Amino acid sequence: MEAEHRSHLRDATRDDEPLLEAMTVEAVYLPDGSDPVSRSLLDDPRLRRYFEGFGTQPDDVGVVATCEGVDVGACWARCFSPDAPGYGWVAADVPELSIAIADPWRGRGLGTLMLRTLLDRLAVRGCRQVSLSVDPASPARRLYERLDFLHLGWEGTSMTMIRQLGTAAR
């Protein structure tokens, strides 16, 4: 994992909202040959809640991967309410995780590094579970399964997965 030696993780802050917005676009799974994601999808309030105002709620937590001085990925979690749920919403006290890496930096172990770090931070904060939403065809699904996320249900065509915290991520 060559990139890990040149990479650095830092805490995500309020100032990272533009990065989290960009990473939200990166996180949208598209099969090979699909048209690029339009940034207009960010007009959807249900998607905007993943990054808008990040760092203003006490349960917001995240890490940013920086390689060669450039922010290349982020992994973050937020809690949502039943009246404004995320796509992988389970309960108001279960944070929902988002993760994305800029395309040129994928496949270098950064996703695993960021995800393990965030899982540890959530456990230290006393969170018992974390959820996420993933397209079943996304390569990220294998990472989640390798780190003990389990299929919980469906939201449209996406899987909701959940992981118990307090257990070591392999």
Roles of regions detected by a PLM:
Residues 29-30, 38-62, 67:
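Active-site rim helix/loop that mediates acceptor-substrate recognition in acyltransferases
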Residues 122-135:
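Conserved GNAT acetyl-CoA-binding A-motif
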Residues 57, 66-98:
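Conserved acyl-donor/pantetheine-binding loop and adjacent beta-alpha core of acyl/acetyltransferases
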Residues 111, 115, 137-140, 157-163:
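Short glycine/proline-centered loop/turn elements that form peptide/ligand docking sites
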Residues 1-15, 30, 167-170:
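Conserved N-terminal entry element of GNAT/NAT acetyltransferase domains
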Residues 107-120, 124, 145-146:
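Conserved acetyl-CoA-binding loop-helix of GNAT-fold acetyltransferases
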Residues 96-107, 134:
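A short, internal acetyl-CoA/4′-phosphopantetheine-binding micro-motif in the GNAT/acyltransferase core
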Residues 145-155:
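Conserved acetyl-CoA-binding loop of GNAT-fold acetyltransferases
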